[in-house]
Amino acid sequence: MARDAKADLIVTVGGGSITDGAKAVQLCLANDITSTEAIDDIRPVKGADGSLGPPPGMKPPAVPQLTVPTTLSAGEFSAISGVTDERYRVKELIRHPGIIPRAVVLDPAVTVHTPEWLWLSTGSGQSTTASRASARARPILTGMRRHCTG
């Protein structure tokens, strides 16, 4: 739809899945990806230093994204998009520094329609992510994290 409409802006209102989907659309538009199978062409590759990054020749997105999040997923601040490969039923990550939305509107009024269970689950998910990151940064916290998370 975005390609047919000759979109010059992608706007999302919703949670992390919507945000991630739009990030993937940005890369698909820029790299002329027109089929599910062709997404393989933009999957991350391991660099000489062992880190994952965009494959050589991947074009950066040309269509910017504006995001209005309604959950606490924080995907609007990440250069990673999670997409499900239905062929293998696995969630894959696509990376490019250019897919971070150019503008994020944080409006609490928009979140009042988010179901409480969803709001709380995305918030607790961020707490888990933060504790994992903290444990990696400070190994002494690993024991504390294990004690807290079981």
Language model features by range: what are they?
Residues 3-13, 17-109:
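Glycine/threonine-rich beta-strand-loop-alpha-helix active-site module
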Residues 1, 5, 28, 130-137:
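Generic N-terminal helix/loop capping motif
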Residues 80-150:
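Carboxylate- and glycine-rich phosphate/diphosphate-binding segment that chelates Mg2+/Mn2+
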